[in-house]
Amino acid sequence: MNLKEKYADLIVRSGLNVQKDQIVVIRASVEMNEFVRLVAKACFEVGAKDVVVRYSDDAINRLRYQTGNRMPYYYEAQFFNETALKGACYLSLVGEDPDAMKGVDPKSLSSYSKALRGMTQPYRDKLDYLQSSWCVASVPTLAWAQKVYPDSKDPVSDLWDAVLKISRVNEKDAIENWNEHRASFEKRVNILNQLDIESVHYKNALGTDLVVELPEGYVFAGGGSFLENGLYYFPNIPTEEIFSAPKKTGVNGKLYSALPLAYNGAIVKDFWFEFKDGQVVDYDAKEGKEVLTSILDTDEGAKYLGEIALVPYGSPISALNTLFYETLIDENASCHFALGASYNECIEGGLKMSEEELLDHGMNQSFTHVDFMVGTSDLSIEATLKNGEKIFVFKHGKYTSEFDEYSLN
């Protein structure tokens, strides 16, 4: 196999963990068609029943949104609901032009996303309750590559080199690389889950000074996830994060972005949020504030945090010292949070709870989930335990030896 074939095989066998007689749904840009064929071939090689590809085109999507009338058709929702009920798994290949929707009203984009999400509850439930696997992976396109490497003579080739490197695809067995990567998360996840943390305090020189309470019965996870049927899969390739959910009403203080946010084809730069009792009460940005407004206006839950994620500064992705303008990659270069929905697996018993029960346990619910990066080289994160003890989880942007050597006995 060449490296691209190895990457496709990794996505199918480890990312999605495709099973015999399973339907695979792929969403991708038309520019990715050659790589999509490699993925489809790998799917059929492991016994997939069918591979259904849904292509999109940045230029056409832009034209449709500019009319202001772009809303989902019933058949779009029916497709996802029907395939979900038939046990399908879902692959999203990202790599669109980061500037594709520049100048398009953000409300048009968020209205479409919100409407489609509301029409696809059966599909969403299969993913949220870990009954169907899903994976997001990146594939270089020309516009994206030129954005990342504007001075390169061959930006697509350079971006492919970076994507394969951060995805741990090399001359070795890529699947074995990911099995080893999975094991690297386990010790820290175990410590976090047994520390009995009450809150964590984030501080850095940008101005971040934020206290985040964790809900009773919080669960940290990292690497991949177990489906309800026991199968293990990796939702993100690459991934470097250990994540959980904050208590919805337990976030107070100011939080500054460390990297630009690429969202729906628009860029937001140098932004911050102020939280009181969990809710965003003030915010601003040097560029793209209207995009933040469209996110926060999605629904009531969009004004609260749903994810807290730990990524050490100096991770393999951050070591490249490159802004990729793609959240999948950039979020794994930096500690981050997400506005909107929390993950059901991030609280004990969450996979058996209704939305109302999750809310009662402090888990935010929303139609949206938008990650943004906050990690810096001077970030500190101090945990306060329920017994009053304090321990620095992060100093200077990285896990501390105090945390890594913490005894749970």
Could you tell me what each predicted segment is?
Residues 356-409:
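Extended hydrophobic packing segments that form well-structured cores
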Residues 103, 147-149, 267, 295, ...:
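Short conserved micro-motifs at the rims of enzyme active sites and ligand-binding pockets
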Residues 1-252, 389, 401-409:
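Active-site bordering "gate/hinge" segments
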Residues 250-252, 268-270, 277-280, 303-307, ...:
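Active-site lining segments that contact anionic ligands and/or coordinate catalytic metals
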Residues 9, 193-195, 264-266, 301, ...:
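Short solvent-exposed loop/turn micro-motifs enriched in small/polar/acidic residues
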Residues 244-300:
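Long, well-ordered mid-to-C-terminal structural blocks that present hydrophobic/aromatic surfaces
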